[in-house]
């Protein structure tokens, strides 16, 4: 995974692009809003400084091949409405974790489902991933439904030692991509 340029992805109505400093307000909102973070334990970015620091950190991690973090925007609009990423790559680069968040004003419209499909396709086809994992809260029904729609299955018996309320799902590369 060495990219000269950030791999922008598009769907019929979305653009998944590189995170920019100008996205700081949405980053701050997504990482600080109580509704968005109800099931997530992570550092907030409740100030412009913290949000910009987060963006700089993400872009440094991209340059060192640790993360692919896409800003989700509606096609032909620049405004960030959410994010989706592949990160926490295994040592052999065959497994990655997927993470995502979305402004509540845009939820329940298929946006994250559409984003996840294009990111999974990219991960399996272009990165050569064999498996993608997702860690989600056991009571986050919307996230669980999204994962199941995208063929993730619950990994029985696997736990997150840092948070026992987290359940772990995984999806394998589809046979048609295996080549």
PLM regions: where:
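Acyl-donor (CoA/ACP) binding surface of acyl/acetyltransferases
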Residues: 1-38, 69, 73-179
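Conserved GNAT-fold acetyl-CoA-binding loop/helix
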Residues: 37-57, 68
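Short loop/turn motifs at secondary-structure junctions and domain boundaries
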Residues: 60-65
């Amino acid at each position: 995974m060495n990219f000269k340029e950030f791999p922008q992805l598009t769907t019929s109505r979305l653009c998944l692009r590189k995170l920019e400093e100008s996205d700081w307000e949405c980053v701050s909102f997504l990482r600080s809003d109580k509704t968005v973070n109800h099931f997530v334990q992570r550092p907030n970015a409740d100030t412009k400084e913290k949000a910009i620091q987060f963006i700089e950190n993400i872009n440094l991690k991209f340059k060192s091949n640790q993360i692919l973090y896409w800003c989700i925007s509606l096609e032909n609009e620049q405004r960030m409405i959410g994010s989706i990423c592949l990160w926490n790559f295994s040592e052999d680069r065959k497994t990655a974790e997927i993470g995502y968040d979305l402004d509540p004003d845009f939820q329940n419209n298929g946006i994250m489902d559409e984003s996840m499909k294009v990111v999974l396709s990219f991960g399996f086809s272009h990165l050569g991933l064999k498996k993608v994992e997702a860690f989600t809260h056991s009571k986050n029904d919307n996230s669980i439904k999204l994962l199941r729609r995208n063929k993730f299955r619950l990994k029985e018996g696997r736990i997150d030692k840092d948070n026992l309320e987290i359940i772990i799902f995984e999806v394998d590369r589809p046979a048609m991509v295996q080549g």
